[in-house]
Amino acid sequence: MYLLPLLFPLLNLFISCILGKFLGKRVLFVLVINMLFSAIFSFWIFYEVGINKSVCYIDLGPWFHIGLLKLNWLFLFDSITSVMLVLVVFVSLLVHLYSIDYMSGDPHIIRFLGYLSLFTFFMLMLVTSGNFVQLFLGWEGVGLSSYLLINFWYTRIQANKSAMKAIIVNRFGDFGIYFSLLVIFFFFKSFDFGVVFNLVQFLDTQPRMSFLGFSLNRVDLIVIFLFLGAIGKSAQLGLHTWLPDAMEGPTPVSALIHAATMVTAGVFVLIRSSPILEYSSTGLFLVSLIGGLTALFAGTVGLVQYDIKKVIAYSTCSQLGYMFFACGMSNYSVGLFHLFNHGFFKALLFLGAGSVIHALLDEQDMRKMGGLIKLMPLTYVAILVGSLSLTGFPFLTGFYSKEVVLEIAFSKFSINSFFIYWLGVFAAFITSFYSIRLMYLVFFARPNSHARAVNSSHESSSFIFYVLAFLGFLSIFIGFIFKDLFIGLGTDFWANSIFNLYVNSDILYAEFLDYYYKLIPLVFSIVGLFFSLFVYFVIYDYTVFVVKNKFFRYAYFFLAKKWYFDLLYNNIFVFNLLSSFYLLTFKIIDRGLIELFGPLSFVRLINKSSIIFSSFQTGFLYNYIFVVLLGLMFFIKLTSSLFFPSFNSFFNFGLFICLLSLIIFLSFGNKKQNI
């Protein structure tokens, strides 16, 4: 029963590959029904494990055994797993249903849904794994599936580039996971969560190395490597560049990647590894710092984007930053609650954007939209609900988790936490601004689309409408429904699945903060909302002001270039690495060493040898006689050394005379020939 949510998506992959060719589009409903069954069993697991506290371990038997390394197929179903199962499977079900209509005109829709099911399966493999190697299998599978889906329209060169960029950038993060696995096995001789989490407290905490001014112990080393992997997969500052380019895939792919899979994998690994993170103060500080910086960075870049999907993509990057610094503040339950809430309203935003793109004949530039509020009122309501929930508007889903994240940062009462708190507050202001900007450019601005696109604009079909309506309902109420269960004071929902040292637990302080401290993030969000309304609905010539003012013009260029990360990476790392490896592999190895010791060297050796041997062909009899005598002397020398050792000196002298005579006569013969 517990493994059925994993088996149905895997079954979908085989059905789409084997039966899709014969059944045609009739197989689509079979795939959706299988995902429905997977969702039903996921809800049952949530009730059985999360509500009834029946944690389940399933050992399917040995996987491989090499020396000290013995691994079994082990599945762990605890509270964390049950929450992630509901989120991943339910969002995947809605995306499958949405894709039937959205991709109806694509001849490869069956392959597309097969890839979606494969994506879902690997994400479920990741969240249900009972050891780090099995988790790594799901981790790599998610990366592979994202490549297939981003590059689904493989005839488009930009899709090819984006898919390659996603998988290459993630390779750098994956090196962190590789090294963390090596270090974990070196210290614990096991990969099982139970063994590692119970023994980590006994590791030597004395500093063993220093890096960038930080003294690191063994636990710090594990945490930093895990964190590097999480940075890559969750698109945090430094390895974020692949996320906006991933928008080249179909819109349902973007919804699934940003709402429930791929980018949430990094946050999940940090939450799952909470027993390790709690013993590393340095690691926790780095997690919270990078999370806060990412929240601010992604928000500022989202301010100047005009691609509707990229605006939402940068909002995902920003919200993941909130989740990271919640984990860095040792409040993993709050981070997971925000991840859970974020999945629903982010899916709503992407699928709503897909409805707009679908209606405008695949147009994604918001400058070419406008005036759609009368043509698509239901889509407008859906995106409005998603945007307000994203900003943390009171009593919507995002409000119940986003505000708590900031309250916890404030309740730490340290300089580091105050700095990160204000990063999050300013990010909340910016989020409100670009959310209203998106609404204005898409629905309220003067129509700038082609007449044919505007005339064909209409609300989407029933599949898309029901999916948006249901996600809109969840984006309003799901946070209120689960707040007390997930992060309520005294809740025991998480039991032992999340570990907190008592010195790091500050949820109690956040609960009893003064109200004016709690209102600061909300006030900044509302101010950002009204400021955006003022800029876009009152000041119509704001672009002229930006262009004329030198400071704002340079600031705009800086943000439009995405803080120059892509430019720096291309000019400093990519170009120099390509030039260096070109010089090494082509100039030095291929055209250098291989030619020197390979074919060219062999040809030169043959030519020189032929010149030397041709010099013996003089045409004079006495030269040939000396060669025969020389060979005879060598033979006699060899036999005498074996049978007549006393004659060695005599034959050595005779052999020397013959060699000397041969050289003289050869020289004389060559000179005579030249004459």
Swiss-Prot record:
Gene Ontology MF terms in the entry: NADH dehydrogenase (ubiquinone) activity
The EC number on file is 7.1.1.2
Entry's transmembrane regions = 3-23, 27-47, 75-95, 108-127, 132-154, 177-197, 211-231, 251-271, 284-304, 311-329, 334-354, 380-400, 413-433, 462-482, 519-539, 564-584, 593-613, 624-644, 649-669
Query: Mainly resides where?
Result: mitochondrion
Q: What cellular component terms from Gene Ontology apply here?
A: mitochondrial inner membrane
Keywords in alphabetical order, please: Electron transport, Membrane, Mitochondrion, Mitochondrion inner membrane, NAD, Respiratory chain, Translocase, Transmembrane, Transmembrane helix, Transport, Ubiquinone
Topology within the bilayer: Multi-pass membrane protein
InterPro entries to which the protein is assigned, alphabetical:
NADH_DH_su5_C, NADHpl_OxRdtase_5_subgr, ND/Mrp_TM, NU5C-like, Proton_antipo_N
A GO BP entry is: electron transport coupled proton transport
Which family is annotated?
Answer: Belongs to the complex I subunit 5 family.
Protein name as it appears in the record: NADH-ubiquinone oxidoreductase chain 5
Question: Which species does this protein come from?
Answer: Acanthamoeba castellanii (Amoeba)
User: Gene encoding this chain?
Assistant: ND5
